[in-house]
Design a protein with these regions (language model features):
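Hydrophobic alpha-helical segments, chiefly the membrane-spanning helices
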Residues: 1-325
Length: 325
């Protein structure tokens, strides 16, 4: 903000990169330890958690006003990337070529964000530079110092989390994919949750939303791209359950942002409550899988019907209001 950069751009880039660091280190650590399923499920689970829980809780604190930049550009881009990841991983392998493509898209998107920092929008105004008692150089030194220590601590934490997750999966006889989608994803998404909650309390809704959208982009472009390259010529193995169930859910939750963001221009408390409900149903689905109940298919049909009913009714209701206006 000192440089007069809009909050939404900071959220989509700098803050998103910082909050996605745990996912990056944990997923890379998982690949190096031969646990591709943990690496991929961490990314997918984090993206689902970010949209349903982080946006849900943040909007319960205060309705999140959505800038038109998010609607017309960033969310469609996130949808396109999510669909591309689903398509490229449909064979069960995210190849190293796919990794190069994802990292190239990250480069293009970063250049795009930098070149449009001062873009004029109908509801975006560049933040005024704030006066700070310290010099910019002192701030920079302090920031770099914190960054170095943070990376060191994250590296140790990532190693412990991956080892602990693998041990837990072996002890309980649970697939690493489920551990990655739930426990690991929740743990690595805590920075996004805390950042967006603090931003919501301070009324910086741009930062709260931009952090989530930016983190979800980085999770797929940077983390999956890096992991697939780190896996060598064989590529990153993608569990069949992720391809059939969890990646489609990730794509659907991303699509769900459009009717919420596009109409009325904000995420209301009620919509945040619905997002949290959907995540609870998602976790219940995983619990039913572990318990091996026979009605898992019926429960999933209920989730899909609930999901479609809620968001279709919300979309139609808000669209009707816009037409009347």
């Amino acid at each position: 903000l000192i440089l007069g950069i809009p909050q939404i751009v900071i959220g989509l880039t700098v803050v998103a990169l910082g909050t996605s660091s745990p996912e990056l280190l944990v997923s890379l650590n998982s690949v190096f330890k031969g646990s591709d399923s943990l690496a991929a499920s961490n990314v997918v689970g984090s993206n689902i958690f970010n949209i349903l829980v982080v946006l849900g809780i943040s909007s319960l604190i205060t309705p999140l006003k959505v800038k038109s930049r998010i609607v017309r550009r960033d969310v469609p881009l996130l949808i396109a990337i999510s669909c591309s990841v689903w398509a490229m991983s449909s064979t069960g392998i995210l190849t190293w070529q796919a990794g190069i493509f994802l990292l190239f898209c990250l480069l293009i998107n970063t250049i795009w964000e930098i070149n449009t920092i001062n873009e004029k929008d109908d509801d975006i105004k560049t933040a005024e530079p704030e006066i700070n008692d310290f010099s910019l150089s002192n701030n920079l030194v302090g920031t770099i110092t914190k960054l170095v220590f943070g990376i060191i601590l994250l590296s140790f934490g990532a190693n412990i989390l991956v080892s602990g997750s693998q041990d837990l999966a072996r002890t309980l006889g649970i697939k690493e994919t489920i551990i990655g989608l739930t426990i690991v994803a929740t743990g690595t998404s805590l920075p996004e949750l805390v950042t967006s909650i603090v931003a919501a309390f301070k009324g910086k809704t741009d930062l709260a939303i931009g952090n989530v959208i930016g983190s979800n982009l980085l999770n797929q472009l940077l983390i999956l791209g890096s992991c697939s390259l780190s896996s060598g010529l064989g590529g990153l193995s993608i569990n069949i359950d992720l391809i059939r169930t969890d990646i489609p859910i990730m794509v659907l939750t991303t699509f769900a942002c459009m009717p919420i963001f596009w109409t009325k221009g904000k995420i209301t408390r009620f919509e945040g409550f619905i997002l949290l409900n959907i995540y609870i149903l998602y976790v219940l689905d995983k619990i039913l899988i572990l318990s091996k109940f026979n009605f898992i298919i019926e429960f999933r049909f209920f989730i899909i019907a609930y999901f479609l009913l809620i968001f279709t009714s919300m979309f139609l209701k808000k669209s009707t209001r816009l037409i009347k206006k």
